[in-house]
Amino acid sequence: MNAKVFVAIAAAALALPASAQVRSGRWGSFEIGAGKYEPDVDAEFATRPGPYEQILGGSGWMFRVGASKAILANDLGAIEVGFRTGYFRKNGNGLIQQTNPDGSTSLVPSGDKTALAIVPTSATVTLRFDWLAERYRFVPLSFYGRAALERYNWWVTDGQGDWSQKGGTNGWSVTGGAALLLDAIDPGRARELDNDTGVNHTYLFFDVTHAQVDDFGSSKSWDLSTKGVSLQGGLMLVF
């Protein structure tokens, strides 16, 4: 190579800001999402439908937000510890006892409104595998697994909006998920976003969670475990 050409290329490279040459360091991640959730409150009742199903119906939307700090990160992925919270609310009508024509009794919906609200809080450990998405942009998928200790803070309101019951139930959860790397759509814009804001990557994620939230098997607590599994999707930023 001509010496003058080599010097010109080297000078141009040195003139670039460091942020344009090297991706910013990895601190952690932030995510926001939502998914269907149905607590297994009726599990203790032999008859169907149980009180929850009669009063509040089936599943509802639970919204979640979380942030994690990477304690170990390399080319394969990262291990993160973090915190998540969210909100769930389901409205319904209370039940009253009705006497049937044959003399038997049954519970039927009344005109009194009621609601169950839950604020879940989670202490999480997440293992992320980003190597495929980082190395092969034609396979822009990242995978992750998460374990968490859970506390679901809940309350029930009456027709006037006052709390009639409240409490907290502890437990655990496990999650497995996949995330689609949106950087692959426009790598140039992704680099600009990293340079300007420090956001390394943007993902759309989808995951499956099983939560066992029953005070570790206590018969005295409400069972707020997921009925089967819950599905969630959302947006995740890695920075």
Annotate each language-model stretch with its function:
Residues 32-34, 63-69, 83, 121-129, ...:
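Residues on the lipid-exposed face of transmembrane beta-strands in outer-membrane beta-barrel proteins
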Residues 20-72, 215-225, 232-238:
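Short glycine/proline- and aromatic-enriched beta-strand/turn motifs that initiate or cap beta-hairpins
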